[in-house]
């Protein structure tokens, strides 16, 4: 059995505070491709952000995460049942789920075992949506600094699974009847302090701090300050979303 790769429990509160939010239109789209709206499963829910979005369109949402600390930081909602469970062994009833969403987490799973679990819990024609996003976009002079921080400073601390995100999960065998998804992007309006908080949520940043004993975001924030000018100024930040969407066919 593959060991759970826990990259976020140690900073679950910061993760909940500084992660970007999925657009409402994404959840509208997921409801549209779902055959019914009785039950959705938000797998690897983290702080429950996507589960709350799904709860606006589904009668019930089961939101699981292998990290108890992440579940403890999740946003409560009457329609959401939070559970500590690995993606590969959810404990959800067979053929009970209309839609599964995995947001920015598939690369941490035992992927073949997860797909087996997804097929087990999905209803006939139930949908699986896998989303990912890479490095943020602000402006060319800022993006160049962020990319250097991503590649050079924290690069050695990214686990090999990160390559799957960089290729938008395109290299993964997807054993479902695949659809051509609509394009979406996440947007936030942050000042420099909020951006620095987000960079600290990167698993590679946390591993850097653990290995080197100091926070590399302090240095990159100073460099960003030279082009940001006023650190209190709010700028628009975007993350293009990449989706792979498929339908379960039992026959």
Regions found by a protein language model. Give the residues of each.
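Class I SAM-dependent methyltransferase SAM/SAH-binding core
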Residues: 41, 47-90
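Conserved catalytic/acceptor-binding region of the Class I
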Residues: 119, 123-189
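Conserved Class I S-adenosyl-L-methionine
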Residues: 167-251
């Amino acid at each position: 059995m593959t060991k759970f790769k826990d990259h976020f429990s140690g900073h679950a509160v910061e993760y909940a505070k500084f992660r970007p939010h999925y657009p409402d239109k994404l959840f509208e789209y997921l409801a549209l491709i779902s055959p019914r709206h009785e039950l959705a499963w938000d797998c690897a829910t983290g702080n429950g952000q996507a589960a709350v979005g799904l709860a606006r369109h589904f009668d019930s949402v089961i939101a699981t995460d292998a990290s108890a600390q992440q579940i403890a930081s999740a946003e409560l909602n009457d329609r959401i049942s939070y559970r500590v469970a690995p993606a590969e062994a959810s404990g959800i009833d067979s053929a009970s789920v209309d839609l599964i969403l995995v947001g920015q987490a598939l690369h941490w799973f035992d992927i073949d075992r997860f797909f087996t679990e997804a097929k087990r819990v999905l209803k006939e024609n139930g949908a699986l949506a896998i989303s990912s996003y890479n490095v943020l976009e602000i402006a060319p002079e800022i993006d160049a600094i962020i990319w250097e921080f991503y590649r050079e400073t924290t690069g050695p601390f990214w686990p090999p699974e990160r390559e799957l995100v960089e290729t938008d999960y395109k290299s993964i065998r997807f054993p479902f009847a695949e659809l051509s998804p609509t394009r979406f992007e996440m947007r936030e309006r942050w000042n420099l302090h909020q951006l620095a908080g987000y960079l600290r949520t990167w698993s590679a940043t946390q591993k850097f701090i653990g290995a080197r004993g100091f926070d590399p975001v302090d240095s990159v924030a100073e460099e960003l300050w030279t082009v940001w000018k006023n650190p209190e100024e709010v700028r628009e930040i975007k993350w293009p979303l990449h989706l792979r969407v498929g339908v379960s066919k039992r026959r």
